[in-house]
UniProtKB/Swiss-Prot annotation:
This is Large ribosomal subunit protein bL28. It comes from the Bacteria. The gene is rpmB. Signal peptide: none annotated. Gene3D superfamilies: Ribosomal protein L28/L24. Belongs to the bacterial ribosomal protein bL28 family. Keywords: Ribonucleoprotein, Ribosomal protein. GO terms for biological process: translation. GO terms for molecular function: structural constituent of ribosome. One of its GO terms (cellular component) is cytosolic large ribosomal subunit. Transmembrane segments: none annotated. The keyword Heme does not apply.
Amino acid sequence: MSRACELTGKTVQYGNNVSHANNKTRRRFLPNLCNVTLISEVLQQSYRLRVSASALRSVEHRGGLDSFLVRADDKELSQRARLLKRQIVKKKAEQAA
């Protein structure tokens, strides 16, 4: 399981710890990932995703998983999230017709 958010693509970053004497040692900045269950209102199903805390706040801000995925850019989403987005868009089109 990779250390990457499935919704925003946020991954591990690298940088330096810098001491008072300006000594630099390499370190990793890990994303704050949480295993959460999000419910799709359109598909009426729940999905377990590994998302960052900031992505979880964004999902709630946009009004749920469905509206977040519809507005999200495909290149940021994981393969699983892209599949979920396609299913949601297809189901919404069926309901509108």
